Swiss-Prot record:
Keywords: Ribonucleoprotein, Ribosomal protein
Species: Escherichia coli O6:K15:H31 (strain 536 / UPEC)
Gene Ontology CC terms, in alphabetical order: cytosolic large ribosomal subunit
SUPFAM superfamilies: Ribosomal L27 protein-like (SSF110324)
GO BP terms: translation
PROSITE patterns reported in the protein's UniProt record: RIBOSOMAL_L27
GO MF: structural constituent of ribosome
Name of the protein: Large ribosomal subunit protein bL27
Family the entry assigns: Belongs to the bacterial ribosomal protein bL27 family.
Region spans: Disordered: 1-22
Membrane in keyword set: no
Keyword Ribosomal protein: yes
Amino acid sequence: MAHKKAGGSTRNGRDSEAKRMGVKRFGGESVLAGSIIVRQRGTKFHAGANVGYGRDHTRFAKADGKVKFEVKGPKNRKFISIEAE
């Protein structure tokens, strides 16, 4: 004879896979055109010179050169640009 009542099943216990966001190439690093610099949600980093953005807001290099991070404007926005070598 059972000494415990049957335990009910839970409806939780799920989690999504990590999306591997963040900075992939840091300031001063050399990059080739097409290299991903930052993976992000929204516009935490804005595109500066020689930087493009994908449809998921990924920032990537449009030209070969060195990565440069800078804060500009009255709202202190973070911009990424590529300085040609």
